[in-house]
Amino acid sequence: VSVLHKDEIGRDTRDIERPISGFEPVLLNEDTLVIPTPGHTSGSSCLLYRDKFFFTGDHIAWSATRGHIYAFRSVSWYDWSELVRSAELLRAYDFEWILPGHGRRCHFERERMRAEMEKGLRWMQSAA
């Protein structure tokens, strides 16, 4: 199933199967949740699969040089403060993998991932 937020739909993507809108998570099936995460763009979204694998697109990734999860401020084309708010809302979810479209992926057990997310959020908030 092709899924895209309505804010991202253009001429070449108007025929997608499942357009979504708004900012509430959308359950695609019993295993997959689409979570709107505006910031990089107004229609940025992430996919949480089986409460384990978090496909983050251009939202967040692991930084080996910084030693924490981070966001791409230099390509936050929509709104950095929205990106930070979106990242803060991710506290509601448990996952073990961050699988970005760009940047490094990372894997931690759930408890450590929560701690790493908090560390990354502190950095994002201070970079605001």
State where each predicted segment sits.
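Active-site HxH/HxHxD metal-binding segment of metal-dependent hydrolases
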Residues: 1-28, 118-123
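Metallo-beta-lactamase
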Residues: 11-12, 33-38, 42-127
